[in-house]
Amino acid sequence: MSASGENGTAKDYISHHLNNLQLDLRTFQLVEPHSGTPTFWTLNIDSLFFSVVLGALFLFIFKKVANTATSGVPGKLQTAVELIMGFVDSSVRDMYHGKSKVIAPLALTVFVWVFLMNMMDLLPIDLLPFIGEHVFGLPALRVVPTADVSITLSMALGVFILILFYSIKMKGVGGFVKELTMQPFNHPLFIPINLILEGVSLLSKPVSLGLRLFGNMYAGELIFILIAGLLPWWSQWLLNVPWAIFHILIITLQAFIFMVLTIVYLSMASEEH
């Protein structure tokens, strides 16, 4: 029997798995699923919890490897960490042409953190929600932080702030304003048009960065939920296994794309005109 058969219709099952565990910051009480449209004061605490835990896991692993690193024959974990660091460092050297000690650590953090959050999509779809409901009494639980648009746009907002910081740092306030108002048409009469064009171009970077990651991971999560909700349990593996194998490529690719675009945007912001 499928999970949908145990918990109601397939529609109910799918809808349940697309609900976040939410906290109303005005009352500090959990929001019941399907109780209405989320507001500005609604916090998706499951997405926040898993993103923080996975970020802490990343820091713990890399800190442990750094403290126990040896110049002799490295272990498997040290080898994996060194390969990741070498790959990220090579990517930064190829794409970032400025001078900054922040970009490489930032790129490493972005790549590994996004990858770990994406990897949560490979867990059995009912495992953690079942534990959350029957052990902790949680009304809902989603375990893939990057399938939550608030998480991906928050990360993109951080990148956007760095874009503004490096743009102003390299060009000064006057140079930054001039870039927004005197390009692409270098004439005072075209300042309003230039401001609209450059403003849209600037704002589209974080929006596209966040929505691209969200869209791909949400779609991947939804496919797993549809397979679990519409098929009997004994036949789910026929689609789950091939999709999971293919999804590993998507998970890695999306983490790489997020890292690359972050580096490219910061490199563009660091260019002097």
UniProtKB/Swiss-Prot annotation:
UniProt-listed HAMAP family: ATP_synth_a_bact
Species assigned in the record: Serratia proteamaculans (strain 568)
Matches recorded under InterPro entries: ATP_syn_F0_a_bact/chloroplast (IPR045082), ATP_synth_F0_asu (IPR000568), ATP_synth_F0_asu_AS (IPR023011), F0_ATP_A_sf (IPR035908)
Subcellular location: Cell inner membrane
Principal place of residence: membrane
Description of how the protein assembles with itself and partners: F-type ATPases have 2 components, CF(1) - the catalytic core - and CF(0) - the membrane proton channel. CF(1) has five subunits: alpha(3), beta(3), gamma(1), delta(1), epsilon(1). CF(0) has three main subunits: a(1), b(2) and c(9-12). The alpha and beta chains form an alternating ring which encloses part of the gamma chain. CF(1) is attached to CF(0) by a central stalk formed by the gamma and epsilon chains, while a peripheral stalk is formed by the delta and b chains.
Pfam families: ATP-synt_A
Alphabetically ordered keywords of this record: ATP synthesis, Cell inner membrane, Cell membrane, CF(0), Hydrogen ion transport, Ion transport, Membrane, Transmembrane, Transmembrane helix, Transport
GO molecular function, one term: proton-transporting ATP synthase activity, rotational mechanism
PANTHER family documented for this protein: ATP SYNTHASE SUBUNIT A, CHLOROPLASTIC
Matches recorded under PROSITE patterns: ATPASE_A
Protein task: Key component of the proton channel; it plays a direct role in the translocation of protons across the membrane.
One cellular-component annotation, GO: plasma membrane
Membrane-traversing stretches: 42-62, 102-122, 148-168, 213-233, 244-264
Protein's name according to its UniProt entry: ATP synthase subunit a
Keyword Acetylation: no
An individual GO BP term: proton motive force-driven plasma membrane ATP synthesis
Membrane topology: Multi-pass membrane protein
Family under the similarity heading: Belongs to the ATPase A chain family.
